Amino acid sequence: LFSIDNFYKYVCRFNVKLNDFKKVNLYKLSDYLRIDANSRINLELKKNNFSNDINGSLLSVINYTKTPMGFRLLNKWLDQPLLEIEKIQRRQSLVEDLVLNSNLRNELEELLGSISDIERINSKISFGNCNARDLIHLKNSLSAVPKIKRLFLDSNTLFSNIASNIPDTEYIYNLIDSSILEDVGILLKEGNLIKIGYDEELDVIRNNKIVGKEKLIKYEVDERNTTGIKNLRLIFNKKTGYFFEVTKSYQNLVPEHFELKQTLTNANRYKTNELLTIENMIFGSESDIIEKEYELFISIRNTIKMNIKTLQKLSDIISFIDSIFSLSIVAFKNNYCKPTLNSEGIIDIK
């Protein structure tokens, strides 16, 4: 409690924002088996004593988790072995349900395999540094949630009780699904983030760009027909934008409103006032699109941020389910039997 009090004073003093801060869970020594550092090493719980990596450790034997957060929780369980018999028996019963129900176990394995690291994505959302691809990973993960919930409710096992605690994330899923492009990039200020139809203003700006491109094509055809320069063509590069290129053999047909910008060995490059007008229309639309898409993305991310507690709860439940699943796999593969526990200090092996 003294440490928590100091932490609270630090937060208040420096005005630290704790958007993703979870509730304080008190660690009671009476709840967990205390294992000293030397014993942890000698037992090779997480690393072997030969190469000092996970291979050959207890963790390597029991780890069949499908998600990063499930793996982290399984690690925590090794650090904090339970002492309370009722809690141990609850885990045992859940593991047993999966061992005895192969259909449930197999379907759960597939669904867990489609879930990304919700816990880490949630943290990035909280600190405002998640990108659009993170949201797509989140959306794809959330698509498995109602399936897991339905699977548990139909299972007639202890997992049906867990299903009732799985939060509703349909709103978050629908928000991302309706707004963020599926093949989105990582960078937020290069556009290509938001779907057509999500925002009316953005659609208008995009349409202006399309109109500009159509005008550009028509203008090229018109100038070719008017000047009689059969090989007149529009060229684009990032430094100078759009320009007309005319080969040396047609220089006598170049009209007065063509302003020379660059001389090449076999051709010259020109600008016109009309070309500049159309170019500004296209480039202006492109910059407006990027700015608007970024603005919309930040708004979407902030909306999801308001539901961060829901995502935290979901992450905790998925990690718990995944850890139980992992134990059920190792129990099934190795044909483990379920031990009966007592508080009398008796070990009876038959």
Q: What does each of the following model-derived ranges do?
A:
Residues 172-179, 242-258, 263, 267:
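Cytosolic, long alpha-helical scaffolding segments
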